[in-house]
Amino acid sequence: MIESDRIITASPFSSQEEVIERALRPVQLDDYVGQEKIREQLKIFIEAARQRQEALDHVLLFGPPGLGKTTLAHIIAREMGVNLRHTSGPVLERAGDLAALLTNLEANDVLFIDEIHRLSPVVEEILYPAMEDYQLDIMIGEGVAARSVKIDLPSFTLVGATTRAGMLTNPLRDRFGIVSRLEFYTSDELSKIVTRSAGLLDVDITADGAREIACRSRGTPRIANRLLRRVRDFAEVRANGRIDRQVADAALQMLDVDAAGLDVLDRKLLLAVLEKFGGGPVGVDNLAAAINEERDTIEEVLEPYLIQQGFLQRTPRGRMATTMTYQHFDIIPLQQAATPGLFNPD
């Protein structure tokens, strides 16, 4: 199974899903659910910048995919009353690509660069003076005839988004005045998001139905909205169109998403640790071979959520199952089963 096949992946499935996501996005900070600290900070910073009639400081948003970094970039531009230009690190292959974007910005506009950690070194070098001095240094000509030309730029706000903050160079990171880490959402926050999205999609849903979807959404709004749409399909075909807890549970079981938000691949990994390696520790290469997956898939796709939720522990000796993992699968640890009298005198 690859990441794009998983219904609980935090990455968008397709351009069609991105269109649906845009329709569900909040457009102002007051409508944005979750990330309370970031939201309050941005309210203050944006209002201060507007009062001074200045561009907002450059903003770096980082955290797991699907948590709302792109949404926040759009909200920042809307709250500032300016235009937003959207691009991504891999698209900006040459210095000229970035120069074309920068020279077309208007005063105080927002330039949003997704996957900013994937900028090439050449493009990144051009970005430094643009961020600091609102100037573009470009080389014209070649060889001995080459000369540097400075072009003044309008003041602007760069909003960078990344899931891999550790891959940013220090010089780039240091040029952001506002740095915010987005965290996984609580079930209560996701319930509000599901309820709001259901209203926009004209879906009849009860509070406990929204809660059931929220609890299995891995702390991620993008997953919550995707599950809502799939549960809606189930409700229209197998029920009366109304989503309550029972309908949501039946639909999510059909989709192989269990009560903890784990799917087939998550369970395959955890059961391998439990059954093939006695709960661990096990090295990631051995684990990858045991479940026939790539090492990168385990480290970048599966582990973050499992570790964050307490199902997996990363130690110097390898990966280990936790007490929660044994309880989730109703499996008795080997050492406990071997000495029943110690734990269960009966």
From Swiss-Prot:
The gene is ruvB. It is found in: Cytoplasm. The RuvA-RuvB-RuvC complex processes Holliday junction (HJ) DNA during genetic recombination and DNA repair, while the RuvA-RuvB complex plays an important role in the rescue of blocked DNA replication forks via replication fork reversal (RFR). RuvA specifically binds to HJ cruciform DNA, conferring on it an open structure. The RuvB hexamer acts as an ATP-dependent pump, pulling dsDNA into and through the RuvAB complex. RuvB forms 2 homohexamers on either side of HJ DNA bound by 1 or 2 RuvA tetramers; 4 subunits per hexamer contact DNA at a time. This is Holliday junction branch migration complex subunit RuvB. It catalyses: ATP + H2O = ADP + phosphate + H(+). It comes from Nitrosomonas eutropha (strain DSM 101675 / C91 / Nm57). Residues 4-185 are annotated as: Large ATPase domain (RuvB-L). GO terms for cellular component: cytoplasm; Holliday junction resolvase complex. Has 3 domains, the large (RuvB-L) and small ATPase (RuvB-S) domains and the C-terminal head (RuvB-H) domain. The head domain binds DNA, while the ATPase domains jointly bind ATP, ADP or are empty depending on the state of the subunit in the translocation cycle. During a single DNA translocation step the structure of each domain remains the same, but their relative positions change. ATP binds at residues 24-25, 66, 69-71, 132-134, 175, 185, 222.
